[in-house]
Design a protein with these regions (language model features):
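N-terminal export signals
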Residues: 1-17
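Beta-lactamase-like hydrolase cores
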Residues: 17-62
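Mid-domain, small-residue-enriched loop/turn segments at the edges of structured enzyme/sensor domains
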Residues: 136-195
């Protein structure tokens, strides 16, 4: 874990000599420097899907999902379709009143509607807010997504509201939150585990790789040849601190995949 990550992510902290000179120690020191320089709280969990080892900073602290919950929502669609619980090719419609900001796909498809599968892809790749709300409407609401997390062993993550209210997450809020430790393992289960069949996992993984916003976050610091994918989230809710989220996977050469 530590060797693969430390060799692949440049943190620019050569002026500090951490007391722990192991790769894990150096990486953790670099993360703390980033946190201090940003004058913010940095929550990180890097999970090695091979060794099951992890390295984290504030990994058990709760942070808001912002749009990152849409990864799990898309996974829920694919999983329940594979299990015969829903038909992901069922077409649904929505009204103009249901459209909101950051809804490029649903705005374009207002007249004709879309399948649940198309909405899942749109909410993962383009963070389409209206697509997420329509899916939540069709699949049982925020509580149903929380139930999906519980069904795969995630006892931490929760969704309580829909867009845009779920982005209002003050520091003391527990609604609509997860922890880096919980989400890194949830990503591992959904992308590399046996929650869904291979074809569905391949679809989800490709959607993550095709998500353009990730190119400006964690993936921007990775070697270009390393396969990777993610889901970002951002909140600039008035009266709350800004929040930036990125969850995903990376496949370093000669190392098991890592999730974060």
């Amino acid at each position: 874990l530590s060797g693969a990550v430390a060799s692949g992510v440049a943190m620019g902290a050569t002026s500090c000599v951490p007391p722990d000179q192991s790769p894990s120690g150096r990486l953790l020191a670099q993360l703390r420097i980033i946190e201090a320089q940003a004058d913010a709280t940095l929550g990180v969990e890097l999970y090695d899907t091979g060794s099951k080892m992890s390295l984290g900073l504030n990994a058990d602290r709760r942070f808001g999902h912002c749009s990152s919950f849409k990864f799990s929502l898309a996974a829920k669609v694919l999983t329940e379709d594979a299990r015969g619980l829903i038909d992901a090719d069922r077409r649904v419609t929505w009204t103009k009143d249901e459209l909101m900001f950051v809804s490029p796909f649903t705005t374009k498809r207002l007249k004709e509607g879309a399948t649940l599968r198309e909405l899942a892809g749109a909410t993962q790749k383009y963070a389409d807010n209206s697509a997420a709300n329509v899916l939540l409407r069709e699949l049982g609401g925020p509580a149903a997504l929380t139930g999906f997390w519980r069904s795969i062993g995630d006892e931490t993550s929760r969704l309580d509201r829909i867009e845009p209210a779920l982005n209002n997450v003050p520091v003391t809020e527990i609604r609509d939150t997860s922890t880096p430790a919980a989400m890194a393992r949830t990503v591992a289960k959904l992308v590399y585990g046996d929650v869904m069949p291979d074809a569905a996992r391949a679809t989800l993984k490709q959607w993550m790789a095709d998500t353009p916003t990730g190119a400006r976050r964690v993936r921007a610091g990775l070697p270009g040849k390393w396969p990777s994918g993610d889901k970002t989230g951002t909140s600039m809710w008035l009266g709350s601190e800004r929040l930036y989220v990125d969850i995903g996977y990376v496949e370093p050469p000669e190392n098991a995949p890592l999730t974060f």
